[in-house]
């Protein structure tokens, strides 16, 4: 029977985008350690990650056809603009399109999405996607102010609200609506620190107890210092190529099965419900549909835990658990390394660190390590299908990527 393609595309608009697009693979990764590095500048961190990714992919700088850089606030943190060619040229990549992407903490996730789009569409074959941030060159109050610029200038920033304050409001509302407790928040921190302690590249390789997490220095009630991600320096990079060309470069490749970038209001008070991130739900739904899988098929996830409540909400919004069940699910140990749905095997932003412009690509790198059976002490038994979720602001941008082993 003949099929009316136009009817199919009308019923499934996302499929129209994908017709004629090529499967894309990650053929190499590279990253720096995350931490506080007073003797390193932004460019040296980014170049280290880029060069490592090209070495991993067995490609030379002259083979790179485009360069994508995620960076949130290089001009504010280190006073340098025009960052993409600044980094690309230092890594030996010349004469190609070099573009910086800014989407708050989802900057490199956004860069990855646009790089994937270009390779999938056949515009380029071999590209590098990097993310970098150098944050510790500024004192903490200045860093907090720079980060707050990803909020709403006319309301939140004018009122003096920082992101710890905004996520504290989110946490309080989630507690009110669903009975989430401080113990549930602390369980996220304890689990992620345990994972990060096994990650040689993590910023804070320190195991903590539930009691320590609960007794942490208050930041914004109910959040303590243990509920907040770290101020870090670091960089990460990947090399993308069409799946059909993988054999030319490597026998270690990971395929992008599904991907989506979505957006929502920047201001928290413009959202209908602050106990959910609509951008996460929408990106997850689109990525699942593209990959042809559902939440139950995902074997592990790298989740954007900028604050512990963000991880709890994300695993609910991504369909891993029902709304309101994220806290108990975590406290029961079901997201631990040996749990049914391991989350943040890298240590997450809480322990691995959060150089904001690097985080999205770093999540991709950590997922690649799991799928390629190279995660060391943190290696999972079930690791063929993973998900990375990168969030910007208080949920204004989200990139969800589903990654799987190459057949």
Set out the residue ranges of the language-model regions.
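Beta-strand segments within the central parallel beta-sheet cores of soluble alpha/beta enzyme folds
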Residues: 61-71, 98-103, 127-131, 183-190, ...
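Extended C-terminal subregions enriched in glycine
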Residues: 277-280, 285-308, 317, 349-352
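Conserved catalytic cysteine-centered active-site region
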Residues: 20-21, 25, 74-127, 134-166, ...
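Conserved active-site "lid/cap" helical segment
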Residues: 18-106, 174-181, 203-209, 279-297, ...
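Active-site-proximal alpha-helical scaffold in enzymes
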Residues: 102-133, 165-198, 238-244, 352-375
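Short glycine/threonine-rich loop-to-helix capping motif typified by GTGT followed
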Residues: 74-82, 268-272, 305-328, 339, ...
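Condensing-enzyme catalytic core mediating Claisen C-C bond formation in acyl metabolism
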Residues: 19-43, 153, 187, 218-282, ...
